[in-house]
UniProtKB/Swiss-Prot annotation:
Signal peptide: none
Gene3D superfamilies: 3.10.450.50
Name this polypeptide is given: UPF0225 protein Mpe_A2093
Species the sequence originates in: Methylibium petroleiphilum (strain ATCC BAA-1232 / LMG 22953 / PM1)
Domain of life: Bacteria
Entry's family note: Belongs to the UPF0225 family.
Transmembrane segments: none
Length: 136
């Protein structure tokens, strides 16, 4: 039996098939992400859905801002490409990604290598390098 469109799961903003089985398990819940890539995907979804509370809750206290500005009116996130996820230590990881968006009719591309740390068993976003150099 094929599910009808009214009951089909919503696609996840991060590009995976179903939000409720992907980033929806972490955005707005207490369930921690099992790894840095999953956390990064949930943070992208939080940007798409304007869930700033999730962004702040998953930002490490040592670098977390006091608040996050609302997105500019008309901003549309178009897609996420995860290029690399690697552990850099027992409690550290990097995720390189490209996120595409459109604002006021212009296409934008954010290429970032984000650093994550595991603190008391939970992964947190630490910081990121925009337009990182190509690894050689």
């Amino acid at each position: 039996m094929v599910p009808d469109a009214k009951h089909a799961p919503l696609p996840c903003p991060c590009g995976r098939p179903a939000y409720d089985r992907c980033c929806g398990r972490h955005v707005g819940t207490a369930l921690p992400a099992p790894d840095a890539e999953t956390l990064m995907r949930s943070r992208y979804s939080a940007f798409v859905l304007d869930r700033r509370e999730h962004l702040l809750a998953t930002w490490h206290a040592s670098t977390r801002p006091a608040a996050i500005e609302p997105p500019p009116p008309g901003l549309r996130w178009l897609g996420l490409e995860v290029r690399q996820h690697r552990l850099t230590g027992p409690d550290a990881a990097e995720v390189e990604f490209v996120a595409r968006s459109k604002l006021a009719g212009r296409a934008h591309r954010l290429h970032e290598r984000s650093r994550f740390v595991r603190d008391q068993g939970r992964w947190f976003y630490l910081d990121g390098e925009i337009d990182p150099p190509v690894a050689g």
